[in-house]
Amino acid sequence: MSQTITIDPVTRLEGHGKITLKTNGEGEVTEAYFSVTQVRGFEKFCEGRPYYEMPGLMARICGICPVSHLIASAKACEAIMSIEIPPAAAKLRRALNLAQTIQSHALSFFYLASPDLLLGMDADPAERNIFGVAKANPKLGLAGIGLRRFGQHMIELLGRKRIHPGWVVPGGVTEPLDPAKRDEILRMIPEAFANVRLALEWYKQVVDRFRDEADHFANFPGAFLGMVGEDGGLEFTDGKLRLIDAQGNVLLDKLQAAQFDEHFGEAVEPFSYMKFPYYKPLGYPDGAYRVGPLARLNIASHAGTPLADIELREFKQLANGPVLGSFYYHHARLIDILHGIEVIERIFG
């Protein structure tokens, strides 16, 4: 007999969602849906607002990654005004964005993913959380807490508060860097390096236990989209867009943000409030693509920092071409963190 299984709400994720599974008479899953159940409405309630309010409003899209939305909105305002921000402001924005990336990735890897990797996917849900991780492997738990604290404290130092900082504005940032704050950030960096390297070593030791999941879970051909620098390297803040296919062929390169709508569209499905972006020439759903850490490492030719370059070369050996398994988002996040710490040290050092 066919059956519908609903998991509502889904826990251990950033946001609100549910999963619906439909099975046939043999108990095999025939359909699976992930539904975003929260109405946001940002596009609508921003209509008619003064442009200079946009960064502050857009930051409220998320309490975990507000800096990305803050900077993207400020850059849109600057494009409207045809202004270029000072180089020092660009560097400070990059540092702030990398701090957010570090704390957000630490949340995802250590708080949301590592309980499954350390304790097992069938472990008691009451124990399968960051507290269970800290109990079973105190060093790993403290490393995760330390990396998240590093990123959050750096955001607070630069932006005056950890969530929704108002430091980034159209035209740059509201104030220059205080040397005392710079020195405090530099003092935190050695511990941050030690924590991410501990996590990378641990992940590489345990990943073989999940080889079946790594090889089969959400492992499918598809496109990858992200930003790269002028030299094709890893970039988070000021790059241009590159799109590759499942074989690694470049479909689009050096695409400006203003050209996005020419090449990409958004589909709507009845089961979710989330929109579904796609590459127009391939249509929907064939033109769907992945973004984020896995996409960034797949599209980038190099990281541009010594330690992350070593890790990226090793990562690219996982497949003959782009790494397609979504399980490897975990690995990619740790490399992103390592790269971010290196760039922050370079900016402030």
Positions of PLM-derived features:
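Active-site bordering "gate/hinge" segments
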Residues: M1-G349
